[in-house]
Regions:
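Metal-dependent nuclease catalytic cores in nucleic-acid-processing enzymes
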Residues: 50-58, 208-216, 298-303, 351-371
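Switch/connector loops and helix/strand junctions flanking conserved nucleotide-binding motifs
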Residues: 30-32, 73-79, 345-348, 378-385
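Active-site metal-binding core of divalent-cation-utilizing nuclease and nuclease-like domains
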Residues: 11-16, 300, 305-330
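Phosphate-binding site recognition
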Residues: 1-289, 304-307
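Conserved catalytic cores of phosphodiester-cleaving nucleases, focusing on short active-site segments
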Residues: 297, 321-325, 333-341, 355
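Domain-level recognition of nuclease-like catalytic cores that cleave nucleotide substrates
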Residues: 360, 366-391
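Mg2+/Mn2+-dependent nuclease catalytic core
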Residues: 41-47, 341-358
């Protein structure tokens, strides 16, 4: 390795008695874009080691500050770059408040420029590091500057950045992606990732990369990952289409139409759509008979998440799935959905009325849409009934 740079640093320090500060942006770009060029990556690692670990050179340096995406690669022996203190999306203590915009900063910007904080919060909130809520600065600033919440994430990276790691599948990853799309959290062992993009050999490794890329957020205490906000959820939807994961993408893409037809009481459309979605969703996922009921209902009405806070009752052991759609505003009426195996739509509607589902609506007074769905295990068909009531 040619140590010309190192020698130059030593000579300058010796002559001028000045110490150096290095600021390196995207320090990991070679590892990310040339990951299979082992020779180049090794040469780059050696360059960094000679610059910053050599005792002769390090005595001439006050600070090295490098920013990037990937953590430092782990080696079978002691890391050649172990002289750095790392802060990443798994653990940024004690500088987490500088990783993104904190909530008080976002509120301040909204007040200054007369923007709707609740709308920005809905689109961009979700990253939490050591209890501190963080927002993506680019997305927040763009939305305030343009006075419109939109997907500004895709202006900074290509969709392949996401799909490359979603495409790893050992039979579990599709199930996990489906789970986080529905707003749930998935267990992940981040220690299985060796910080090496050439060694993505498990769903845990793939998920950990997505955490470092900010497509997933990470809860260190619970050791779970999740999609942080609405903007990133839209990125995953684009990725599903790009990957041609029809078994998930088709039900999601049809969910807006299903929601609209449900409000119209079009039971024929509801039954037909649920039948098709059951065929799509029952096969690929590691779900038992009862669990798949909830998945079908939630994905079938996926687009409604934009307008509703969806609460579900854990009733899978009873062979049914119960969901309460609580609107964020007064423009949408509440919707209560129950799906039950080997029943009738009338019986399901009666059961909705008997249960205390309406408690989740608080002091709401007005129209409520009830959707009762029965699933026949013999015919593999759905039958539905829609009823509008007044509270």
């Amino acid at each position: 390795m040619d140590n010309t740079i190192s020698k130059a640093i030593i000579r300058i320090n010796s002559k001028l008695n000045e110490r150096f500060i290095f600021l390196i942006d995207e320090w990991d770009v070679i590892y990310r874009e040339q990951e299979y060029n082992t020779k180049l990556c090794d040469e780059y690692t050696e360059l960094l080691r000679n610059l910053f670990k050599s005792s002769n050179v390090s005595s001439c340096i006050d600070l090295v500050y490098m920013t990037g995406i990937l953590p430092i690669r782990r080696y079978s022996t002691q890391s050649t770059l172990n002289m750095f203190t790392e802060y990443n999306m798994l653990d940024s203590f004690p500088i987490e408040s500088y990783v993104g915009l904190i909530e008080t900063e976002v509120i301040g910007l909204c007040n200054k420029y007369n923007r709707d904080f609740n709308e920005i919060k809905k689109w961009y909130k979700g990253y939490i590091l050591n209890g501190i809520s963080l927002y993506n600065p680019i997305s927040v600033v763009e939305s305030i500057f343009r006075n419109e919440c939109d997907e500004y994430w895709n202006k900074t990276s290509s969709i392949e950045t996401l799909t490359d790691y979603m495409n790893y599948d050992n039979g579990k990853l599709k199930d996990i992606i489906c789970k986080v799309l529905l707003g749930e959290k998935a267990k992940v062992n981040v220690r299985k990732f060796e910080n090496d993009l050439t060694k993505v050999n498990s769903s845990d490794s793939a998920l950990t990369i997505l955490i470092h890329l900010d497509y997933l957020a990470y809860d260190k205490k619970l050791k779970v990952c999740y999609i942080p906000n609405y903007e990133i959820k839209k990125e995953f939807e684009r990725a599903l289409k790009k990957l041609n994961w029809k078994e998930i993408y088709n039900p999601i893409s049809n969910s807006k139409k299903l929601y609209e037809e449900t409000l119209k009481g079009n039971v024929e459309f509801i039954n037909k759509t649920l039948d098709e979605n059951h065929k799509d969703l029952a096969g690929p996922f590691n779900k038992n008979k009862e669990d798949i009921l909830g998945v079908i209902v939630e994905i079938s009405y996926y687009s409604a998440k934009q307008f509703y806070n969806i609460k579900k009752e854990d009733t899978s052991i009873l062979g049914r799935s119960d969901l309460s759609f609580i609107p964020y505003d007064n423009c949408h009426i509440p919707l209560i959905v129950e799906l039950k195996v080997n029943s009738t739509p009338d019986e399901v509607i009666a059961q909705i009325k008997e249960k205390s589902y309406f408690n989740s609506l608080g002091n709401y007074h007005g129209k409520v849409s009830l959707l009762g769905i029965s699933y026949d295990e013999k015919t593999l068909k759905h039958n539905s009934k829609v009823l509008i009531i007044e509270l």
